[in-house]
């Protein structure tokens, strides 16, 4: 399945509580993503009060990512298909 990096901008920052409420919210995002076959792998958050993040997703196509973004009320900016290249590639 193709892998994508998704840029998301949060003008007021992204604030996810580190407690049961945050876990419930993230669980809801995961469940909603599955309705379109999208798997959230992980996300890198910026150091500027979490105003931009870069999520890594497996999905059939960018449109599926946009659909679940809308369902989850999350902004979706640039979507780039990526592949992994690590330093052990040549060994």
Residue ranges and their predicted role:
Residues 1-35, 39-42, 46-50, 62-63, ...:
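Short S/T/G/P-rich N-terminal loop/turn motif that feeds into the first structured element of a domain
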Residues 58-85:
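An amphipathic, aromatic/His-enriched active-site/gating alpha helix that lines ligand/cofactor pockets
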């Amino acid at each position: 399945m193709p892998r994508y990096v998704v840029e998301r901008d949060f003008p007021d920052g992204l604030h996810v509580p580190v407690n049961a409420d945050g876990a419930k919210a993230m669980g809801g995002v995961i469940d909603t993503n599955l309705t379109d076959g999208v798997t959230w792998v992980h996300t890198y958050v910026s150091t500027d009060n979490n105003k931009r993040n870069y999520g890594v997703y497996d999905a059939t196509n960018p449109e599926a990512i946009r659909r679940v973004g809308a369902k989850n009320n999350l902004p979706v900016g640039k979507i780039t298909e990526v592949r992994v290249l690590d330093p052990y590639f040549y060994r």
